[in-house]
């Protein structure tokens, strides 16, 4: 029985890294509250791209950036609205 590859040869798959690289997990739960609010919003919105959920996602990502759990980036690069000018 063949393995499905031409010639029956096994090839090593080379994984592709994520676009933004790896980032540390929030082991200390520093941003857990923001994450829970976002996930609850997504459940209520039936996983639709709701504006208020996007703002909660922004809060969560800001928390991750503030605690060095991800690299800082501009909101437009993350598909989120810019901060309001005050």
Swiss-Prot record:
Residue ranges of every copy of the CHCH domain listed in the record: 28-71
Alphabetically ordered keywords of this record: Cytoplasm, Disulfide bond, Mitochondrion
Motif Cx9C motif 1, residue range(s) on this chain: 31-41
Coiled-coil positions: none
Compartments, record wording: Cytoplasm; Mitochondrion intermembrane space
Cysteine pairs bridged by disulfides in the record: 31-63, 41-53
PANTHER family the UniProt entry points to: CYTOCHROME C OXIDASE ASSEMBLY PROTEIN COX19 (PTHR21107:SF2)
Keyword Mitochondrion assigned: yes
Gene Ontology process terms (BP): mitochondrial cytochrome c oxidase assembly
Family: Belongs to the COX19 family.
Function: Required for the assembly of mitochondrial cytochrome c oxidase.
GO cellular component: mitochondrial intermembrane space
Membrane-crossing residue ranges in chain numbering: none
Motif Cx9C motif 2 per UniProt: ranges: 53-63
Signal peptide: none
Protein's UniProt name: Cytochrome c oxidase assembly protein COX19
Segments for region (Disordered): 1-25
Superkingdom to which the source organism belongs: Eukaryota
């Amino acid at each position: 029985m063949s393995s499905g590859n031409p010639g029956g040869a096994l090839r090593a798959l080379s994984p592709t890294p994520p676009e933004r690289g790896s980032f540390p997990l929030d082991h200390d739960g520093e941003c857990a509250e923001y994450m829970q609010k976002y996930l609850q919003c997504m459940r209520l919105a039936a996983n639709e791209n709701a504006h208020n959920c996007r703002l909660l996602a922004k809060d969560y990502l800001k928390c991750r950036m503030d605690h060095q759990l991800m690299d800082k980036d501009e909101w437009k690069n993350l598909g989120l609205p810019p901060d309001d000018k005050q």
